Amino acid sequence: MDSNTVSSFQDILMRMSKMQLGSSSEDLNGMITQFESLKLYRDSLGEAVMRIGDLHSLQNRNGKWREQLSQKFEEIRWLIEEVRHRLKITENSFEQITFMQALQLLLEVEQEIRTFSFQLI
């Protein structure tokens, strides 16, 4: 796990939590929650990959891990679309920078999860 990615997650989550987007603050809180969940999932996959032969353990813990993986990719796609939408509608440069960095981070995390999952398959 890249320490820069971890600090990027923490930085973006902190900045997103400080944003006041009016009536859409509940949506933003939902995005933050999904972002945190995605980070934890990515981290757990990375740890599983680092432990050689952990596929059996992963399958025993969660017999439906492929289903869960598919669900996480759907969440990533939804978050990417949501961040892109927010990026288009916001005029605040602080928010634009935050959402651009969140988008970049989501794309990096998607790639990391793909890499981890291929190593586990």
From Swiss-Prot:
Compartments (UniProt record): Virion; Host nucleus
Disulphides: none
The organism's place on the tree of life at top rank: Viruses
Pfam families cross-referenced by the UniProt entry: Flu_NS2
Location of the motif Nuclear export signal: 12-21, 85-94
Main location: virion
Known role: Mediates the nuclear export of encapsidated genomic RNAs (ribonucleoproteins, RNPs). Acts as an adapter between viral RNPs complexes and the nuclear export machinery of the cell. Possesses no intrinsic RNA-binding activity, but includes a C-terminal M1-binding domain. This domain is believed to allow recognition of RNPs bound to the protein M1.
Family classification: Belongs to the influenza viruses NEP family.
Full protein name: Nuclear export protein
Protein's organism: Influenza A virus (strain A/Pintail/Alberta/119/1979 H4N6)
